[in-house]
Amino acid sequence: MPQSPNNRPLRLRLPLLLVPGLTAVCLAAAALGGAPAPVRISEAAIPNEPGEESPGGSATTRDSIDTREAFSHFSHGIGLEGEAKFKVGNAIFRKLWVSAPSSTTSSDGLGPLYNSRSCQSCHLKDGRGRPPAANFPADTAESMFLRLSIPPQNDEHRRLLAERHVNTINEPTYGEQLQNIAIQGLDNEGHMHIDYKEEPLALGDGTVVSLRRPTYSIEGLKYGPLHPDTMLSPRVAPPMIGVGLLEAIPEADIRTRADAGDKDKDGISGRTNEVWSAEHNKVALGRFGWKAGKPSVREQAAGAFAGDMGLSTPLVPNPSGDCTAAQPACLNAPNGNTERDGGLEVGAKLFDHVVFYSQNLAVPPRRNFNDPAVNRGKTLFYALRCQSCHTPSFTTGKVEGQPHLSKQKIWPYTDLLLHDMGEGLADNRPEGMADGREWRTAPLWGLGLTRLVSGHTQFLHDGRARSIEEAILWHAGEAKSARDGYAALSKADREALIKFVESL
């Protein structure tokens, strides 16, 4: 964020925003550019639609959402057989894996290099991860990872990228992801270090909000230097709720919202990410991950087992995880592949249970649905055109064997498309068709329960935002006008908009 020469908070240049029936407020302009023409926003209330209080349709949980287990309930209508399968998947999701060989052969195979011993350690109570609180060694950052890649170095690299067989070219020594933990007898790869710089920003009414800008580095590299062109991208583990419903949205309904060339000239140009499906051996629509780099829950789960824990699955059968040719001791370490599990560490049956569990983590119902302040916030959300990317609703298609997820009107507030979010949030690291400034629109359902479930309120792909307000103020690029509109609102209206988002 730019600062004034005297180091006072930057005060955005604000033209008049005319809102019928309201006191005139100011609209934040482009950082230091000229003021746009006055904008009129209708104050017409946005009515609540039938069923909107149940964002997951009939699959929305009916269980209590007043405890840390609010994200850990199974989808309503799952049936007795489904409930039993869900509970087995839950046990595997929370299991602490150990290195091989071990007397507990059903739980060994961890690593050799890894970031976490369980799925639950990353997805805190099935919710959102967080950046390390105080850096290593005070915090090992189990729920935040550092992705690594390099630009294509030769024709083979360029071919693989062009044909979508890979999303990135891995760093040659350290692979796709920095692993900060190793099994006994091996060195870990190093540790992520974060430095934050506080940058004050003055809003239209004079309120000053401090945003923290992170800088990432790696300390204690154990296997030699990084490639000189290495690109780093931090990733916090996202919430798990509703992913089966997102997977059930018909592909055509997502594609129809894409507008890569902004043909309608509304300033919003969402794009799909086209990625390789190892399961189907073809290019497919990306849906999951911060840049929509995975096409399905199965492939997202397999990638996490391999990269985060070093465990082999039917889709990623390599037991060495993210080890590279530059790490022979890692490649030659004992593994937990067993005949019982089809020569894998996470056999097909175990893997299917984890996938089913993930697909059926239920969305919680709306809170404070009829609160006047929440409804006022909804009006402002639409007035600022936040819904242009955070698409309120879809109807799911047919899900084979899971009728409770089928034909449901859901309210995830995402379009699952890639959008340019500006230089401030850019990681400058392409992933598939996503460039360094693009991110997939994050679903908003359950956002207001983050503190209860995960014990914090840190948002965005790297957890830099310490509140919903900070997350909004980091928006730029295609979301700049919405961010500027938010910055121009009165304190009461900003609070109302946040109450609406917290109610989803």
Task: Put a short name on every predicted segment.
Residues 1-12:
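N-terminal secretory signal peptides that target proteins for export/translocation
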Residues 2, 29-504:
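Periplasmic c-type cytochrome electron-transfer domains
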Residues 6, 20-21, 393:
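Intrinsic structural disorder/low-complexity segments
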Residues 12-14, 495:
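Hydrophobic alpha-helical segments, especially transmembrane helices
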Residues 15-30:
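Bacterial N-terminal signal peptides
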